[in-house]
Amino acid sequence: MAEMDDNVVYVGKKGIMNYVMAAITQINKGEKEIHIKARGRSISKAVDVAQLLKNRFESDVTVENVDIGTDEVEADEGGTINVSTIDIAIKKP
């Protein structure tokens, strides 16, 4: 099993505030930079998490970098499908 990074919040099917609170927890632990990552339909939720974090909860954080890409995932029927990805780097001074 892959080891989870402490400074990464993986966005999925849960509510947005769960991920915002996870990011705030990482910042309060002393992380200077966190990454909000998502794939597919969760990309818009990851953007919402970053914006809520920046505009409502931690006004001194900045969006350092946004990486977009594509992952190849094995389909249930065989073969591969392309899934879009996003990685939003948030930095606290």
Features from the language model and the residues they span:
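Ordered, soluble secondary-structure elements with a strong preference for glycine-centered loop motifs
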Residues: 10-14, 37-40, 47
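Short glycine-rich, basic-tinged beta-strand/loop micro-motifs
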Residues: 28-44
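C-terminal edge-of-domain segments
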Residues: 64-93
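Beta-strand-rich binding-surface signature
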Residues: 6-8, 24, 31-35, 60-65, ...
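A generic structural signal for short, solvent-exposed coil/turn residues
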Residues: 1-3, 28, 58-60, 80
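Short, hydrophobic/π-rich interface segment
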Residues: 42-69, 73
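Histone-fold modules and their flanking histone-like tails across chromatin and transcription assemblies
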Residues: 1-27
